[in-house]
């Protein structure tokens, strides 16, 4: 890859996952944030979405020691604080890198059992240019795969198709100065064991990195956003944090080149505390040539939203909750998280069946 942006891409990727730092994924689509607001009986309109994102973006108090990047939805990229400052300017002042979700959602692959491919390659180069000009320095694209061993899912067709589109997206991003976050999410839905999850995740990641190599992706200027290796939600045997850490790190060791700067895990419907504890379990293990960090949406925001409740009087209390969760995950990224009291919302299941983002 001979992009004029090579040095910048490498520096950005390193900064996002510097020691103790990870990503806040705040790029929920309008429909998804609507579902979150519904839980607190809040109308899903542009002003409420703006106010909620101001709560997150306006959090100071050293949040930038824990958060290296924040992924925004396109609407948010152009929104402003109540005092008129652009969200992007506030983030730049805090030296938090700005990311943007660039995929257009999933569509079924014909001839499969409901398996999907991600749309959004058309016009992507132009959009990347526009986002770079608006201050974005990284992007995210989510592919979705599911495990159903009885139906032979994920099929080879689904794996190949999603690996290819992830690699095309990554190449277009790097050409235009954006660090690509490559996200092949294998959903938690199903009754598979943690061992079966490890086997499938290995197969998927091997295909993804073969495609990235075929497309000449600069791995030092890219980040991987995979699922942790966990058992299916309907599996009677629940894996421990230690097992999840061990199987996840082993899977990465077998498939991910050490040239890749970092791996930022999705929380995928784990509780807030599970997502933190499982990340910590990986970071106490040996032989990790990459930064292993977080790119959490629900697992950084669920308690924040339930504390806020849409009331301006609760903004500061909600920001304290956000800071606390960010700090816990920062400690986990360093392998120094020692646990915490499980308050109601922090240990509440965040699982949504067949999760659409």
UniProtKB/Swiss-Prot annotation:
InterPro entries assigned: Aldolase_I_AS, Aldolase_TIM, FBA_I
Q: Does the keyword DNA-binding apply?
A: no
Annotated catalysed reactions = beta-D-fructose 1,6-bisphosphate = D-glyceraldehyde 3-phosphate + dihydroxyacetone phosphate
Q: Which GO terms describe its biological process?
A: fructose 1,6-bisphosphate metabolic process; fructose metabolic process; glycolytic process
- State the active site: 183 (proton acceptor), 225 (schiff-base intermediate with dihydroxyacetone-p)
Pathway entry: Carbohydrate degradation; glycolysis; D-glyceraldehyde 3-phosphate and glycerone phosphate from D-glucose: step 4/4
What's a single GO CC term here?
phagocytic vesicle
Please list the residues that bind substrate.
49, 140
What's the Enzyme Commission number for this chain?
Answer: 4.1.2.13
Q: Which Gene Ontology molecular-function terms are recorded?
A: fructose-bisphosphate aldolase activity
Keywords from UniProt, A to Z, are: Glycolysis, Lyase, Schiff base
Q: From what superkingdom does this record's organism come?
A: Eukaryota
- Family under the similarity heading: Belongs to the class I fructose-bisphosphate aldolase family.
What's the protein called, per UniProt?
Answer: Fructose-bisphosphate aldolase
Species = Dictyostelium discoideum (Social amoeba)
